[in-house]
């Protein structure tokens, strides 16, 4: 069932997709996740390494035939898939890590379509019988498979077959926090890409909401203390929930606003900087969706919310890391600027509406009295209601350059979805933006550009020209930031 798109570009075939946006917020991984990643890297020797092969392919350049490179890559991927059913847990983890790297760096839809059932069975066993590290890697691979297969029948079938397992691990309090974290991210991304039924969307929203809502006080009560090991899980669940909000029907958005907008500000006092930033960006997204739903939307506790945002935007507590304070202040300055301008716009609109009514009433009464005194019919003219040209708060625009193209991230919805794909694809994000039809469709980039080697070489600038461009950009950026720093006190 198609769903309304919250982004700027239309979805091909009438299907729904929202715009995404880049965000610096990432879920806290915790020590267990770091150990899982290091162990997986150390055990990739059980399976052939993809990294060394990729480096050799890159160094080969034009000397190696492109078709031969693709065949070599697929041969190694076949070995990784076979290793998923190995009896050794370390071998399975190494195969999952290698698959994760391959799917993030390459586009392989045809290869995956032929082995979709095999991969689904292997991932199901890893999620069912594996331990924390194996479950976390399996969930990460599942999210990448959904990105590779897209919203077609195979992708939808894959997500539906493994969705119950993701929910089971996510809601299991005894499971590893790292496994639950990756299951939350995979559930949100898989539902966004592959779920076509509104009921699936609502069920995923409810499941994710239940994870982070437990850390919020009910009915204005003080939020319960959350263990440090669960901060990453709460952050991932909140970000996945916000991702699905961008494609949520408007009929459900209004209920979510009433239920969650009073609760989310409690997360702004969390000990985790990532969770605080995720909560702030989600609040800004909710206000953006509320404005799209109803221009006269009013939040009753706006003063307290702006006070909390202003405190975080100017936070200088020394017990927090300097890098965390800088990132937090940057994020919350944008959130505060957006929410504060939204409040000012709502107040101005409400004031204009009220005084127009008062003015109209007074004018009619004055003219009526004058007409009665003169015993002549009066003519009351209706005051003109010219539309307001004042613009409310907007998300700071971010420019993403890849190849010869540019992506503009100009809303909180686009920002959240760009960040979701960036988190799962990592350094392969630019490659997928250039070649993955799903991402190009979501962000409105049009068909894939086909450029030969001659065209690419003609577009490539020299090292000296690049140096001049970087120097000019640095100078302009320094001037712009200096002006912002001078006016920062006025904004806050």
Kindly give the residue locations of the regions a language model identified.
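N-terminal "cap/leader" segments of large eukaryotic alpha-helical scaffolds
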Residues: 1-106, 459-492
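Core helices of alpha-solenoid repeat scaffolds
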Residues: 70-80, 112-123, 154-167, 180, ...
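Acidic, Ser/Thr- and Gly/Pro-rich intrinsically disordered linkers and low-complexity segments
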Residues: 78, 177-178, 212-232, 316-329, ...
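Short coil/turn segments at helix-helix junctions and helix-capping linkers
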Residues: 82-91, 122-136, 168-179, 214-217, ...
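Long, hydrophobic/aromatic-enriched structural stretches that serve as scaffold segments
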Residues: 129-151, 315-316
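Hydrophobic residues within the alpha-helices of tandem HEAT/HEAT-like
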Residues: 84, 98-106, 123, 138-149, ...
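Long C-terminal extensions of eukaryotic subunits of large macromolecular complexes
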Residues: 1-24, 36, 320-492
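Flexible helix-coil junctions and inter-repeat linker/turn elements that act as hinges
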Residues: 104-112, 132, 146-158, 171-179, ...
